[in-house]
Swiss-Prot record:
CDD domains: SirA (cd03423). GO terms for cellular component: cytoplasm. Its main location: cytoplasm. It holds the Pfam family TusA. This is Sulfur carrier protein TusA. Sulfur carrier protein which probably makes part of a sulfur-relay system.
């Protein structure tokens, strides 16, 4: 797979639910449609919460790496 270029990075390491998703929501509000946010997290709940957030808020989860820590998610603002 080609490398995904991110416009922004969010470090959520050490944070626990619901903080990572709250931070993602705040960051995405300040982004333009089509920009990509790289989220780095280690909370196991993010494997469920980030995809659900994207679906509920109409953002695109471009890719995720959740086989080992830290977890990484690439989220594009909008569909």
């Amino acid at each position: 797979m080609n490398e995904i270029i991110s416009n922004h990075t969010l470090d959520a390491l050490g944070l626990r639910c619901p903080e990572p998703v709250m931070m993602v929501r705040k960051q995405i509000r300040h982004m333009q449609d089509g920009e990509v946010l790289l989220i780095i997290a280690d909370d196991p709940a993010t494997t469920r919460d980030i995809p659900s957030f994207c679906q509920f808020m109409d953002h695109t989860l471009l890719n995720s790496e959740t086989e080992s820590l830290p977890f990484k998610y690439w989220v594009k603002k909008g569909l």
